[in-house]
């Protein structure tokens, strides 16, 4: 490691603490309270407290430290992570049928994320504001309004970007974790016997003593590891080593000390169960703690919102969601984006959730099903990558998968008990997103196949036009083409109706590669098909936004001079009608028509001046 890298490592690690660990770092606000609040029939006896603490600690070790940080983070696509990246990697060296199954798993995982992301800001901010019940009990009726006000401000500032505010995230979250550690250590010193719960035998004893009820209680224990997926999803922003370093040096010790500190407090004062986190603090520190808890939960919510924007952009670029307006809020960092439609839809959903559930304890009952479902899918996809891409021994990979599923499946099954008490919410939202993504992908494929059924050869058509040219007019025409060797619809209709052709014709295809970024050297490929026809293929990664002006600049460097304001862009605009279908496919077709009508039009997607665009309409039956 170079000197420069050594100097920058602390800064990157600090930044990772500020962004990556917001969700899991605010879990102590509510996790142990939900475990021991009486909903499972446990009292605050020593065996129950020690059992829950042991389960929480060893889940943090096994799921976060071993599974995600050690194993899953090995699977990266040019340094990027996330469930859709894992899906893409897993399907690279498999059969078509297996790839289809893996794609479905990846889309379900992505859909689950959309389901949980509605709950995360609500439960995080509400659990912090609920500290008012301790500071000033008479203000408890203000918890819901204040939570909505805080989140309204957060969603309103999204369009301005978080570059300036983001600089404060890291020091605030570092302070938060140090406070977690300090509060916990203070309580542990007063009752050090709680450290016996570090022994995993207490977790085993917990299951043996409480049997079926202990299994159901896993639905509350899982709250301690929500946010684990963010470590993998944010890998591209900070790198593997800083994320791992932050976990083992700051986050894990702080979480452990705080959970065990809460346990020590409950053994000494069972009445503290109403809010063991805030009651760890002395009276004089309650208001400052409430303020920094609110800030920490806002930061956790911001990380989740940014994650939704990133996942949506990736899904759009990979063709699983319809094109939508994406605004870059930073000239320096391509990952800082704002998607207005997603932002306000998420805001409305979060407000409805807060008003409907009214208390973080009620939200906790809805939290966990989608998280644990994603954990199961991550285990299957990551071990598939280990076998197919890394060529690990199949028996060793099977052993790893069994070990992961022995933890993931019980956690997921235990959370199914929450289905009627609120777990239906993330599952319903996830199901809607899965239907939307699969509908757009499959119907889009059906449309393109229908449009390319004419079967005419591009080479033959160009040869015919060069041999018997129509009237040629001065200038350059660019025809946007979705496929490389297919005649663009706009070209056929221009010749059919206008019977003219420009002196120079460029067939432009914008392609999304299976990588986050494409190097500028490989950005543009130019091929001259005839004296007056050129084919240009511009490649972009799924973290990049295509820009025709940049493509023209690259073409100029390669010897094909193009000027935006002297070029006419011909595009086809499809007017879709539904053909005869079974009722269920007709419903899917109607959903696709709705998505198509509201999709961002091509000129806006590719930043083409509207006065240079000519759209030729055509009716297509699907």
Swiss-Prot record:
This is Low affinity potassium transport system protein Kup. Its main location: membrane. Responsible for the low-affinity transport of potassium into the cell. Likely operates as a K(+):H(+) symporter. The chain crosses the membrane at residues 9-29, 49-69, 103-123, 137-157, 165-185, 213-233, 247-267, 276-296, 337-357, 363-383, 396-416, 419-439. Belongs to the HAK/KUP transporter (TC 2.A.72) family. Keywords: Cell inner membrane, Cell membrane, Ion transport, Membrane, Potassium, Potassium transport, Symport, Transmembrane, Transmembrane helix, Transport. Signal peptide: none annotated. It is found in: Cell inner membrane. It catalyses: K(+)(in) + H(+)(in) = K(+)(out) + H(+)(out). InterPro entries: K+_transporter, K_trans_C, K_trans_N, Kup. GO terms for cellular component: plasma membrane. It is a multi-pass membrane protein. GO terms for molecular function: potassium ion transmembrane transporter activity; symporter activity.
